[in-house]
Amino acid sequence: MTTTAHQAAPLIPRQDLFGNPTKAGGQISPDGEWLSWLAPKDGVLNVWLAPSSDPAAAKAITSSDNRPIRQYFWAPDSKSVLYVQDKGGDENFLLYGIDVASGDERTLTDFEKTRAMVMGTSQTIKDKILVGLNNRDARFHDAYLLDLNSGELTLVQQNDAYAGFLADDNLKLRMAVRPNTSGGMDFFPITDGTIAETPSDSTGLEDSLTTQPAGFTTDGKTMYWIDSRGRNTAALIAQNVATGEKTIVAENDKADIGGAMSDPKTGEVEAYSFTYLKTEWTAIDPEIKASLEWLDERLEGEFSVQSRTEDDSKWIIGNDPLTSPTKTFIYDRNAETLTEIYTSRPELIGAPLQPMQGLELTSRDGLTLPSYLTLPPGSDSDGNGIPDKAVPMVLLVHGGPWARDGYGFNSYHQWLANRGYAVMSVNFRGSTGFGKDFISAADLEWGKKMHDDLIDAVNWAIGKGITSKDKVAIMGGSYGGYATLAGLTFTPDTFACGVDIVGPSNLETLLATIPPYWEPMIAQFHERMGNPNTPEGLAMLKERSPLYSAGNIVKPLLIGQGANDPRVNQDESDQIVAAMKEKGIPVTYVLYPDEGHGFAKPENNIAFNAVTENFLATCLGGRSEPIGGTVASSTAEIVEGAQYVKGLEDELSD
């Protein structure tokens, strides 16, 4: 028996891929005096601060001892750092602030069952921000002015109908956004605090996910839009506020304009990006163009500008070399120096990381499906993108579904490829970034044409000799979890096994239990998924719900769920597990009492991945690192089916 190259490649420890990064999320303060990043303190991600002249002098300024801090930002005056945090994954985020000079930390939105959101920041009013709070009515966010020095909250606009507001640099509300009955949006001007009775702009369903205002210039004279009206892909539009005239700033015929760099002082767009298979930047400003070209000459792989000082002299650059761990640099534009601050996961230096291929696949009805493929190490000796012989494959399906997969370092691709699997991610119809027609092609197609796209990708891979018909697993989170359940119920012979993470099993109950602050979007959900208030819509939702076809499942299934998930309630997993048990169908069910829509705590994520790779090893025959105490070190509850995963019963009996 010969040993293949991917079997001989070193096994990358799960901890190295899914444990805490050494550092991540680097930023520079607007005044350029401070560097900040996320790093572990006592095993939990916290915000760290260092003088920009001495990164080695960093110290933790937050003290979260339970859930990792994953989002933070600088106050415009550089005097405080702000972050949001929820409890147990319930997504009721509160806003916290740390005074840089004193180190004092306080809760800025101290309300129960409230989801705080930042509505606006300013270059001219640097000690205040606009925040939205839904503590009065969980469906709608009232707008408040928050004084970052005193902590005082002042009501700016009570909200009884709107999905959101847009503010200018004076922190004045200038536009209100309200869903309409067609599933689109109406945009209402606000003048001196009064919301207009009739909208100045509107979208229908087809433009609802690809058209939105994108902010004002600092002087308030220009408003930017990302806009797909009258076109397919979304363009960047500049609107003269005084005259209403709109001018196209940027467009691309294959992908939506997805990102922009704006002058920190004027707010004028200086560069823009679109992402088809890879992200491409185009500079409008000649000095920005020169800087981006200078960086491109010196950095391998992909890079992005993560943070800029107010005077624009220093940038924080994130660099993804693709087959080595990501790095973060400080770029001094005046001195033309590029200095590494940190490598996020230095333990991956020298690991057998694999390149990702960007592919264009074709669906059975002629749509182009931008996709990504990663092969096991050593499996493709001639480098033609096809393994020398067929290998097992994991179809890794993204969530949303109104989201997308992208190019670059992906810990799941690297992990699964290292275990001996080809890994394919498909931007099926409904994925965002590729124009409104591609999104609309998915309307009312959950479990139908959206699923057909995934099956077409699998058949392509089989036809190319990448994998074999009996060695394909399906795995994903949220919508990807639904796709897994759909795969095992609607096409029960296609996949060898499936891994469902926080996936809905019943579309009717999913729509009935959405978070209250999503209720303004319910008309769009009904138009795109199915309307439970009509007999036809309800029948379709039931037909597309894997729960009602649970008896079709004949292949192994692993389910992971967070008990506090506000989007896909625990009942979505409980229901299908109960239905399978009633029919005597085996299933393994892992529940986390302190998690929500996904697993934020590294020890919980690592534990589930330990179970997953040992589950896949039995199903597909790949390699696996033993479970080795990871489940015991997590909060995982094995509700059902420990006996179906290699080593799991032993772990529980220790």
Regions found by a protein language model. Give the residues of each.
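Cap/lid segment of the alpha/beta-hydrolase catalytic domain
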Residues: 347-473, 477-478, 483, 505, ...
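Active-site-proximal cap/loop segments of hydrolase catalytic domains
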Residues: 428-654
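Short, Lys/Arg-rich amphipathic segments at extreme N-termini
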Residues: 8-28
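Conserved hydrophobic/aromatic "anchor" residues
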Residues: 28, 37, 74, 216, ...
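Basic/polar N-terminal segments that are highly enriched at the extreme N-terminus
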Residues: 1-15, 650-654
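Generic beta-strand/beta-sheet core signal
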Residues: 50, 226, 239, 272, ...
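Peripheral, non-catalytic segments that deliver or gate enzyme domains
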Residues: 2-4, 18-24, 34, 42-50, ...
